[in-house]
Amino acid sequence: VAAAIILPFSVEQEHPIGWIIKLYSDTLSSYAYATLNTANWYYLLSANWAQLTLLTGRALPIATGCCALLPLLALATSCIRKKQPFLVRLLRTQNGQISLLCAVLSVYLFVVAAVGCTWSLYGYAMMALVYGTVILCCLHHSDAKHLPGFLALLLAGIYVLAVKVHERYLFPALGLFLLGYVCSRDRRLLWLMIGFSVTTFLNTAIVLDNSILYGSSLGHLNDDTLALNVILCVLNLLLLGFGAWVCLTPDWSAA
């Protein structure tokens, strides 16, 4: 489908294949900010419109790295309590592999904290965590009925935890949540669709309202709605946490 859409525009291009890659590359490079008016993790960290090359300070990557070790510690504790082989669960189970992924992220964050962590180094690592988690869940739950829900949760994870994100980037996920419910009958996906619809609507409404009132240069998540902005950020983080549970247990509703 993507090729059919791109092909008509490729005929007159000097580089029939490379032009689309360059277009996306140039577009992404123009968004060199931690977040762009999005009620997500980075807005809570006061990084709205913060240049990606700016340093985050050491506290953020160290704190995140410590939190990323918790799944591994929980797995080890569970193995000791149940007298199960740790390496088998670590390498062969979904939760074990995700725990290992988090541990790798933790080591990376400790290293960049020591040498100087920028928003780009931090944000791309969080993006890799989201992609890795969803891919592992897809591998362990390969039934096609789960795919729309996984894709929606991937977009939600990127929306909340990745850099270079606009407030409108979650729109496709809302339709995928609904499609995921139709395919899997998991009502949790409906709750996620409703929750993210509310936060995204309010987020976008604030930005558009400010653009109309003050012009495009001031059409942002400004301090005059700071309390609401923070509430939306917290709600999105809570929704993502709920979404992580859905992602890890896609067959829960059928149990």
Outline where the language-model segments fall.
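Multi-pass membrane glycosyltransferase architecture that uses lipid-linked
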Residues: 1-22, 31-33, 42, 47-255
